[in-house]
Design a protein with these regions (language model features):
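C-terminal segment of classical bacterial N-terminal signal peptides
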Residues: 17-29
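Intrinsic disorder/low-complexity detector
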Residues: 11, 22-25, 394
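Feature marks short, surface-exposed loop/turn motifs that line or immediately flank catalytic pockets
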Residues: 199-200, 269-271, 351, 735
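Hydrophobic, helix-prone linear segments
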Residues: 271, 328-329
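Divalent-metal coordination cores built from histidine and acidic residues
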Residues: 189-236
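Bacterial N-terminal signal peptides that target proteins for export
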Residues: 2-14
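Intrinsic-disorder/low-complexity accessory segments
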Residues: 33-189, 230, 236-237, 242-244, ...
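Short, solvent-exposed turn/loop segments enriched in Gly/Ser/Thr/Pro and often Arg
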Residues: 193-197, 208, 264-272, 792
Length: 938
């Protein structure tokens, strides 16, 4: 058999990936299968060449789909540009740049005639999606004229390599296919092929290909997160929209193109199978239009049927995996709240061949596994073959059901408008519990039908017609505006009052914000303002709770500390719709005093101003008691800035854009002051990247805190007090530490040092009890501040803080975490009491919403520890799911601990989780400044 030597080195990859600029019509070459000695043997090509358009095998160094080969984004991008030149079925458009500055490309594929009329079809999609002002007759006319718009993405999770490698084949086949199905489907659809993580593909592919010997290639030991800040959590950002890539995708989905189907491709499939395809397991979110769920199930079933008809076994659905439609915020789930079908597939495979495992029960056909697959060797090309079939199934469904898909988008949007214009009631698990309690033991499970009116359909239980945000009652107005901007970035209509108005006897000023539920994206509006009520899911009565796929409660208005009025009756207001992203009302300098400036502590943006002042060598103070300034009362922690030419310039330049007021006063406010000092923050990370650390890195950058990333080796060897004032250990930053009452994390696998480039070897290592903990304790005793969050609170205990975990069993001195049957609280929003006179809580309200996720709370056991945030009720649940929430009562969620001359701040509540809870950011930010300011106290 003929042997072909593979190209070696990244330089060869880049050269080969960009040198081809003209179409080739070459004889069909073999798809390379690489042997252990680095040579390849011929096999049938995945995609044969067609004259006029360059085939993948003729462009890339090796055909994508070859064992032990990955194309990177540079090559992928170059190939898209070439296809754009060669085919009249494709139009290539940039839809933004990534966090690392790469261009995100979207290949729009359809017939030449459709591509010539994209603006018309885009307008049809928009009008049907938004529904407002479109009658049913007009909707049917538009649906008859329009084209189904389908989004198919690749590469969101960069180590899930099948999707990008397969997408080049999908594109080529669609651009060159002359078969009846291709021509029919392209005529009836507009296909949007987007790459959603270019930075990650470049990192992962280059890392994988860096070794010459194919069998040594791996991407399991990549050195950092494959999205600059969020890693795998780039698929948890869709409602918050913090990252550039998320904003780019959301703009296409909800503000420009409004696809009716969003197909988000992932890995990996269930063990002993090939691919997960919907239908999903329950629960589905109660805010969703039922039609979006039935259509998602319908399309998923069509995908299974296509695979089965082609003899491709191993597709599973429903309970074969944990995926559900409960959680908003993912690329495929946020579409549900916008009346679009969201398809997730999770397929096995990668450039390194693998084996399908033999799982005995998966050899028996059933409704959620219609065609089992036997154990066998599996190659990347096999996954790409399945990907082509699944893509074809989605496209064919959209084409065959074009008018229905388009019209149903309007129907669901109009449902939202109509439901938001009348009295409606949503049934949740809590309502079912109330019906059961009111009905007693009903015959065959039924209760008195009259209870529907007396228990459920009461006036006070009606769903909201809208929400009003009064700018004058916000503790942190810029954060509230940021919340509104997340809605706008998700296509929600937000209105701004042009003049004062009154609703239900309450007077609202001009500039108030109104979000009505009578709009197409009503499900998303409700999901962001209203509490999630997750069912109590168990396999059997009294059994352990079943873990949700992601968090159970996440109401964003609660997390961001937004004060809003929930209006249950129809109302009108003199408003105009916001046409783009809002800016917070400009802050002002109030008063004419010359001694200095007083700024409230309530707005997170005050930390940006503080950090700018500190960077300029100016040292503000926090005043320990409330302050009166120009007729306003500012709470404890108000910021005092003595006047100077430099300070005045910084304050006056900053307050306007930051949306915070500064009071110019004639004398320093009375009361004790805490002088702040410049801080040097060390943010602890690990080789491979810790997602919570990445999110925190993004957060620190937004609020202009100076910081460095520090790794375990440096913690073990450097003079920590000479380099840092604060060390931050986010959740999972120290997974090898153990402490009674916590579930063990365990070590993450790390590569051998000699296999890692020199500049990255310092990233290796672990935080250990034997070496690292004593050095961190010494750092704190000498005046350093240690911040621990989530599971990293094990470190706080090991440092000797006089606190103990509260959510534990203690049997004969043996302390263990509570079993899930005794306490279970997957990511949810809880209400907590705050000690606002503690500097750690300056700027906080006395009662606050905090995010908590199956973590640990504390009991203070000795002097030197102060409780700052407490769960003070039998059931603090605000949004989500809590099993035995009474276990939390009177336990501490945040504690302030003295340790020698330094501080330890332990956060059981996840006060920064995924950069969402703006309402608790200041608990974290305060710690970064308060600890160093109090260091060396008597």
């Amino acid at each position: 058999m003929k042997r072909i030597k593979t190209p070696a080195g990244l330089a060869a990859l880049l050269l080969a990936g960009t040198c081809l600029t003209a179409p080739l019509a070459l004889p069909s070459l073999a798809l390379a299968e690489v042997t252990a000695d680095g040579t390849t043997t011929e096999a049938s090509p995945l995609t044969p060449a067609v004259a006029g358009v360059t085939a993948p095998k003729d462009f890339f160094p090796q055909e994508p789909g070859t064992d032990y080969y990955l194309a990177n984004y540079t090559q992928y991008e170059a190939y898209l540009k070439l296809l754009d030149q060669q085919s009249d079925r494709m139009k290539l458009e940039s839809f933004g740049t990534t966090e690392e500055g790469r261009t995100q490309w979207m290949a729009i594929v359809s017939t030449p005639e459709n591509l010539a009329n994209l603006e018309r079809y885009k307008d049809i999609a928009r009008r049907l999606a938004k529904a407002e002002g479109v009658s049913e007759d007009e909707a049917r006319q538009l649906a008859a004229e329009g084209k189904a718009v389908v989004w198919i993405d690749a590469g969101l999770h960069a180590t899930e390599t099948v999707t990008t490698q397969g997408q080049v084949h999908v594109l080529y086949r669609l651009l060159t296919g002359q078969d009846a199905e291709t021509q029919r489907t392209l005529n009836d659809t507009i296909l949007l092929f987007g790459h959603v993580n270019p930075d990650g593909l470049e990192l992962v592919a280059d890392w994988y290909m860096r070794k010459d010997k194919p069998e040594e290639r791996s991407f399991r030991d990549i050195p950092r997160l494959y999205q600059k800040y969020t890693g795998h959590d780039n698929n948890r950002d869709s409602y918050m929209v913090t990252q550039a890539e998320t904003e780019n995708v959301n703009r296409i989905h909800y503000r420009e193109w409004f696809p009716q189907i969003v197909y988000n491709q992932h890995q990996t499939g269930p063990r002993g199978m090939v691919v997960f395809i919907p239908p999903f397991r329950d629960p589905f979110n109660y805010n969703l239009d039922s039609l979006v769920m039935t259509t998602t199930n319908e399309l998923g079933t069509a995908m299974h049927s296509r695979l089965v008809s082609e003899g491709k076994g191993g597709s599973g659905a429903d309970t074969v995996a944990s995926y559900s439609t409960w959680h908003n915020g993912m690329v495929r789930s946020t579409p549900y709240y916008h009346n679009a079908v969201g398809i997730l597939t999770e397929i096995i495979g990668g450039p390194t061949p693998e084996d399908i495992a033999l799982v005995p029960e998966h050899q028996l056909a059933r409704s959620d596994l219609p065609l089992p697959i036997a154990p066998r060797k599996w190659h990347l090309r096999d996954s790409i073959d399945y990907q082509w079939s699944m893509n074809r199934a989605v496209i064919d469904y959209a084409a065959r059901n074009r008018e229905r898909v388009l019209f149903n988008m309007w129907r669901m949007g109009m449902n939202g408008i109509e439901r938001g214009s009348t009295d409606t009631w949503q049934i949740t698990p809590s309502d079912v519990d109330r019906l059961r309690a009111a009905g007693g033991e009903g015959q065959r499970g039924a209760v008195d039908a009259g209870l529907m009116a007396s228990v459920i359909r009461t006036s006070e239980n009606r769903e909201a017609r809208g929400y009003i945000i009064n700018p004058e009652t916000q503790r942190d107005l810029p954060a509230s505006v940021a919340f509104l901007n997340t809605l706008i970035k998700n296509g929600v209509d937000v209105e701004v009052a042009e003049r004062p108005f009154t609703v239900n006897g309450t007077r609202y000023p001009a500039g108030s914000y109104v979000v009505k539920t009578a709009q197409a994206y009503r499900p998303h509006v409700l999901d962001m303002f209203e509490p999630q009520d997750h069912p109590h899911n168990t396999d059997y009565p009294g059994g352990p709770p079943k873990l949700p796929y992601d968090v159970a409660g996440y109401t964003l208005a609660y997390q961001m500390g937004v004060n809003f009025d929930r209006i249950q009756d129809g109302f009108e207001a003199p408003t105009t719709k916001a046409t783009d992203i809002l800016s917070a009302p400009a802050g002002r300098v109030i008063g004419s005093g010359r001694a200095g400036y007083v700024i409230g502590h309530e707005a997170n943006n005050s930390f940006i101003l503080t950090n700018r002042l500190l960077a300029a060598g100016i040292k503000p103070e926090w005043i320990s008691q409330s302050v009166r300034a120009n007729g306003e009362t500012l709470g404890a922690g108000a910021i005092w800035v003595p006047a100077s030419e430099q300070a005045t310039a910084i304050v006056r330049e900053a307050v306007g854009p930051l949306g915070i007021d500064a009071h110019a006063v004639a004398r320093r406010p009375a009361g004790d002051g805490m002088a702040l000092k410049p801080v040097r923050v060390g943010l602890v990370d690990r080789y491979g990247g810790v997602m919570s650390s990445g999110w925190t890195r993004w957060l620190l950058e937004q609020y202009e805190f100076p910081f460095e990333v520090v790794y375990p080796k440096a913690l073990d060897t450097e003079d920590l007090n000479a380099k840092y004032d604060v060390l931050v250990f986010t959740d999972t930053a120290a997974p090898t530490l153990s402490y009674a009452g916590y579930r063990n994390g365990g070590a993450w696998s790390q590569p051998a040092p000699e296999t890692v480039p020199d500049e990255m070897r310092g990233w290796l290592g672990e935080v250990t009890a034997e070496t690292t903990v004593p050095r961190i304790a010494e750092f704190a005793r000498k005046g350093g501040t240690v911040v621990t969050i989530g599971n990293s609170n094990r470190l706080a205990h090991l440092l000797g803080a006089p606190i103990e975990p509260a959510l534990v069993n203690n049997e004969n001195g043996r302390v263990t975490p509570l079993a899930t049957t005794d306490f279970f609280l997957p990511g949810s929003v809880l209400s907590a009491s705050v000690e606002t006179t503690n500097p750690l809580a300056y700027g906080m309200p006395e009662q606050a919403d905090v995010f908590f996720s199956n973590g640990q709370t504390f009991r203070v056991t000795g002097e030197g520890a102060k409780t700052v945030v407490t769960f003070d009720s039998e059931n603090p649940l605000r949004s989500g799911w809590a099993h035995h929430p009474e276990r939390l009562k009177d336990t501490a969620a945040v504690v302030d601990v003295d340790l020698g001359e330094g501080k330890v701040f332990a956060y059981g509540a996840e006060v920064t989780q995924r950069a969402q809870p703006h309402g608790t950011f200041r608990l974290f930010f305060n710690g970064l400044l308060y600890g160093p300011a109090s260091a060396g106290r008597e």
